[in-house]
């Protein structure tokens, strides 16, 4: 009986809790319905939120969107200072009883997206791009300072990328206290003001700091809407004590902040696609046919854009994206710098993109079975040890394992310490590519021209034209005009006059196909050492790959096949299971991956090297030249963009680079900070030197 009473009491408490939470959700929904006037005449809304807030607050936004016209889209950008707030929020979300099946589906999708408490911006995409959540885990003022804004003013424009409104989240006694209470300051609200439209109000759910927030909003030019109290009628109260002159002063200060930030980034251009209403020129042209181009097509389709893909093969993923299996895991560095941060975010984004495609019914082979990385000699082992001990890595990103744990994780005898990436695994690249393109075709007007080998591109009167040599006549077939052209063509990235100077080099890679047998059948995680070895898929393991610079041909190589076998044996010396690695069938696949010296992808405006080189003749090796290169917009080919240089980790880094480029092309705030955009910019190899006064 006592146990029965406890159970009844527990159920009663749970019922009471859910009833209260549902009532709070209704209150939030009522509040947001009062804000519907902000959406009048707009297709896209950008909400900013200081503090992770409550489950009910998030669900209220989703509920509001569900009742809005289907053409309306929301980008919700959440800024949370305390990383340890996230897991408790997800736990509460998982245990929440939704009032509707639609919200239940959203909750399930969000929890499956598995956001992780790491620094930076994690992009979560729902409802085919209709609802996008950017989760910024860091000091909000640091996140806002590093946020790159497209060229714009603060006017209330339907197409403005700036924030339409902000909320300051309530604190919740049932969760970890948010760091926002310590973060709210005049300096923070000026950064909020910088990224906001002039008319954007602030809605305050934080009753504890109501008076202080009201004063800060007055000083930074915001109108404030807040609840009177939790016990009073749920009617928002608008507060704005600014005179017309004070308002103008605040708006000028915002404009000055935007200008100052823009001036600091002139050498890292972030151009966007030009737009012409009802024009065929507004179609986005992409040259390519692999992971990068397919995922760019999908990201553009989620924004209702028209896309034409030009591929020189008979189908997608016939080049480097055509392997049977590819490992997915982040590239970590001891300093956990911008490159390391990018790969962590890319790693998580690729997982979520795959999960979304699988949920939509597309067939993609994969297994998130983890990745086990071990050294193959003393130097590589020491480097791995340095990486894993240098930072307090999130355990879901990576953690160290000893020799016994490594064997248990792998299912076979490894007997080496190393790094385990629990969320990693393998994905079938060509199926991942095809699924992304097929999904894009469902969402928007997206199609491909196959067997179309573009030999030449040119710009005339601001439009781009693509030229193909016709086989029968030797003449040219021309496609265009297009306002926007993206080169995402892998090994052909620098084949055109406009891109031939890009600092990316082709490396041949032969991946060997190994029949699954004996001890290899027990392998249950991806092994990475001097090369990689995957668990079997359809009776075949993949291992490799060779690494040959500027290859003369792409034929099968017996010597590279033998080298792949030797790499496995060298990596796991004396292990009996390596005798089961059989290369005698001579089964392999060869591709060329484009590699950059700094291991970062290339994403962004196509640099005009001819103009850079010409200007360099008059501006070099002096303090004045440093000032010139920092304060002069870097030369670019207007309307031409680059997406490539993905190297050996294309399925880890490519989808996020594609999503970021789509955001850039569409004039949105990019989900990468300014330092990362500088890291990825195709002009970086030259501009790094020039802004330091070094020789080109």
From Swiss-Prot:
Gene: mnmC
InterPro entries, alphabetized: FAD-dep_OxRdtase, FAD/NAD-bd_sf, tRNA_MAMT_biosynth_bifunc_MnmC, tRNA_S-uridine_synth_MnmC_C
Claim: Cell membrane is one of the keywords in the record: no
Protein's recorded name: tRNA 5-methylaminomethyl-2-thiouridine biosynthesis bifunctional protein MnmC
Region (FAD-dependent cmnm(5)s(2)U34 oxidoreductase): 287-696
Entry function: Catalyzes the last two steps in the biosynthesis of 5-methylaminomethyl-2-thiouridine (mnm(5)s(2)U) at the wobble position (U34) in tRNA. Catalyzes the FAD-dependent demodification of cmnm(5)s(2)U34 to nm(5)s(2)U34, followed by the transfer of a methyl group from S-adenosyl-L-methionine to nm(5)s(2)U34, to form mnm(5)s(2)U34.
One Gene Ontology molecular-function label: tRNA (5-methylaminomethyl-2-thiouridylate)(34)-methyltransferase activity
Keywords: Cytoplasm, FAD, Flavoprotein, Methyltransferase, Multifunctional enzyme, Oxidoreductase, S-adenosyl-L-methionine, Transferase, tRNA processing
Enzyme Commission number, as recorded: 2.1.1.61, 1.5.-.-
Keyword Nucleotide-binding: no
Pfam families the UniProt entry points to: DAO (PF01266)
Catalyzed chemical reaction(s): 5-aminomethyl-2-thiouridine(34) in tRNA + S-adenosyl-L-methionine = 5-methylaminomethyl-2-thiouridine(34) in tRNA + S-adenosyl-L-homocysteine + H(+)
Subcellular location(s) of the protein: Cytoplasm
Family statement drawn from the similarity comment of this UniProt entry: In the N-terminal section; belongs to the methyltransferase superfamily. tRNA (mnm(5)s(2)U34)-methyltransferase family.
Any one Gene Ontology cellular component term annotated for this protein: cytoplasm
Chain segments carrying region tRNA (mnm(5)s(2)U34)-methyltransferase: 1-262
GO biological process: methylation; tRNA wobble uridine modification
Cofactor: FAD
Organism for this UniProt entry: Shewanella woodyi (strain ATCC 51908 / MS32)
Record-linked SUPFAM superfamilies: FAD/NAD(P)-binding domain
């Amino acid at each position: 009986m006592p146990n029965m009473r406890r159970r009844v009491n527990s159920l009663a408490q749970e019922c009471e809790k859910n009833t209260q939470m549902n009532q709070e959700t209704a209150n939030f929904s009522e509040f947001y319905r009062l804000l519907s006037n902000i959406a009048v005449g707009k297709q896209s809304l950008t909400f900013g939120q200081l503090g992770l807030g409550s489950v009910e607050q998030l669900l209220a936004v989703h509920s509001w969107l569900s009742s809005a016209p289907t053409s309306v889209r929301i980008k919700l950008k959440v800024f949370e200072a305390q990383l340890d707030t996230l897991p408790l929020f997800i736990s509460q979300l998982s245990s929440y009883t939704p009032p509707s099946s639609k919200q239940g589906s959203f909750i399930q999708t969000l929890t499956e997206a598995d956001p992780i408490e790491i620094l930076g911006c994690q992009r979560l995409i729902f409802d085919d791009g209709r609802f996008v959540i950017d989760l910024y885990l860091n000091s909000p003022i640091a996140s806002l300072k590093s946020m790159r804004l497209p060229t714009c003013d603060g006017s209330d424009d339907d197409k403005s990328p700036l924030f339409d409104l902000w909320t300051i989240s309530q604190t919740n006694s049932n969760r970890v206290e948010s760091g926002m209470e310590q973060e709210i300051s005049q300096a923070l609200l000026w950064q909020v003001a910088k990224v906001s439209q002039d008319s954007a109000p602030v809605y305050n759910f934080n009753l504890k700091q109501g008076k202080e927030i009201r004063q800060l909003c007055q000083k930074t030019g915001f109108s404030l809407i807040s609840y009177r109290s939790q016990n009073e009628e749920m009617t928002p109260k608008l507060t704005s004590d600014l005179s017309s002159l004070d308002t103008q002063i605040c708006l000028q200060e915002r404009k000055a902040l935007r200008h100052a930030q823009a001036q600091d980034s002139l050498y890292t251009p972030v151009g966007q696609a030009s737009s012409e209403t009802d024009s065929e020129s507004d179609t986005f042209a992409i040259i390519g046919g692999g992971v990068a181009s397919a995922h760019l097509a999908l990201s553009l389709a989620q924004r209702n854009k028209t896309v034409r893909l030009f591929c020189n093969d008979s189908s997608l993923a016939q080049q480097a994206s055509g392997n049977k299996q590819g490992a997915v895991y982040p590239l970590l560095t001891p300093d956990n710098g911008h490159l390391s941060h990018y790969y962590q975010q890319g790693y998580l984004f690729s997982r979520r993109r795959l999960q979304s495609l699988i949920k939509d019914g597309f067939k993609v082979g994969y297994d998130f079975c983890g990745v086990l990385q071990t050294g193959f000699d003393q130097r590589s082992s020491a480097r791995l040890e340095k990486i894993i001990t240098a930072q307090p890595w999130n355990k879901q990103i990576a953690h160290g394992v000893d020799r016994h744990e490594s064997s248990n994780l792998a299912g076979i005898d490894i007997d080496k310490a190393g790094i385990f990436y629990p969320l990693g695994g393998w994905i079938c690249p060509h199926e991942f590519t095809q699924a992304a393109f097929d999904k894009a075709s469902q969402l928007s007007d997206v199609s491909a021209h196959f067997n179309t080998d573009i030999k030449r591109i040119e710009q005339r009167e601001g439009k781009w034209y693509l030229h193909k040599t016709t086989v029968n006549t030797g003449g040219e077939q021309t496609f265009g005009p297009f306002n926007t052209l993206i080169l995402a063509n892998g090994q052909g990235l620098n084949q055109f006059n406009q891109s031939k100077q890009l600092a990316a080099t082709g490396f041949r890679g032969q991946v060997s196909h190994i029949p699954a047998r004996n001890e290899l059948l027990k392998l249950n995680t991806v092994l990475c050492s001097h090369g990689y070895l995957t668990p079997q898929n359809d009776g075949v393991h993949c291992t490799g790959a060779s690494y040959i610079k500027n290859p003369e041909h792409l034929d099968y190589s017996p010597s590279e096949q033998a080298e792949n076998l030797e790499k496995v044996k060298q990596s796991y010396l004396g292990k009996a299971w390596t005798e089961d690695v059989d290369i005698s069938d001579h089964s392999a696949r060869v591709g060329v991956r484009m590699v950059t010296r700094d291991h970062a992808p290339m994403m962004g405006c196509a640099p005009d090297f001819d103009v850079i080189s010409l200007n360099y003749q008059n501006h070099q090796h002096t303090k004045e030249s440093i000032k010139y290169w920092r304060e002069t917009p870097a030369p670019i080919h207007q309307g031409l963009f680059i997406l490539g240089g993905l190297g050996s980790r294309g399925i880890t880094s490519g989808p996020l680079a594609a999503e970021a480029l789509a955001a850039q092309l569409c004039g949105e705030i990019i989900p990468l900070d300014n330092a990362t955009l500088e890291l990825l910019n195709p002009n970086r190899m030259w501009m790094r030197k020039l802004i330091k006064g070094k020789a080109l």
